[in-house]
Amino acid sequence: MDIRILRYFLTVAKEQNFTKAAEQLNITQPTLSRQLAAFEEELGTALFIRGSRSITLTEAGILLKRRALEIIDLEEKILDELKVKEGLIEGTITIGCGEFAAVETLAEICKVYKQKYPMVQIVLHTATADSVYEMMNQGLVDIGIFLEPINTEGLDYIRIMESDHWVVGMKPDDALAEKEFIKKEDLIGKPLILPERVSVQSELANWFGKDFSKLQIAFTSNLGTNAGVMAANGLGYPISIEGAAKYWREDILVQRRISPEITTSTVIAWRRNIPYSLAVRKMIEEINAFQA
């Protein structure tokens, strides 16, 4: 298996047609078909369902597509990291994070960093903590921002001083919007939208106590933006950290803090004892300088 064949496979998967893919790759269609057929034979499984008009992926093909994208991304990161010119720092830094207030701290750090190293491209990948953690372990994300609790074994990190408050989102004309704080009894019997992350749900379960079993959970969501869209359409009340809904227009969605309050700390973390590129090492220096 080589990178070239994976690129061929991904192009066919994208175009869903061998002829169009061959044109994109500047090779003949028979050559492309022959090489991918040999690739399927090497793997011992079919990757494509070949229809009369289009091509779709088998289950094995879908799995390979996901892994192939990770491999291509990792290859590009390696090439970027090796292209450090003397006296000039270039390359790409990938930062994984969710939607929370600490992203404002990240923006402050990135602003200082970009003034010093304008040739470095910063890629922001928005995802759940579990996804970011997995991608860090795979080498696809250099730096992650996590809400606690998070397993910091094997990680170096700094803790952001400002805490994120937990809030309930609602339409501005909702009766709950008239309250200064939302108590757990206000939410019993109402359709709720909870975070998807199990450890966060456990924290909310502790807050609700024995009433947790009475909750009407209409949705779970891994990102606050999508939960906010559901709430704006009257489909539920998202319980999330304040940063996830901070930038909603107040004529669309408002938020009220819960009482008794729950606050959550945030960490910026990176893997320990990893030979990072110079661009990433300089970013870590800026992160540590911010803490100091």
Residue spans for each PLM region:
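Hydrophobic two-helix hairpin corresponding to the core of helix-turn-helix DNA-binding domains
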Residues: F9, A21-A22, F39, T58
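Short helix-boundary/capping micro-motifs
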Residues: L10-T28
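A short LG(V/I)-centered, amphipathic sequence patch enriched
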Residues: E40-E59
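Short beta-strand-centered segments that line the small-molecule binding cleft or hinge
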Residues: R66, K85, E108-V112, A129-W166, ...
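Central regulatory/effector-binding core of bacterial HTH transcription factors
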Residues: L88-T152, F212, T220-L223
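Beta-alpha-beta core module
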Residues: E153-R159, S163-H165, N222-N273
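Flexible hinge/capping segments at coil-to-helix
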Residues: L155-W166, M170-L192
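Secondary-structure junction motif
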Residues: K190-F212, Y276-V280, I284
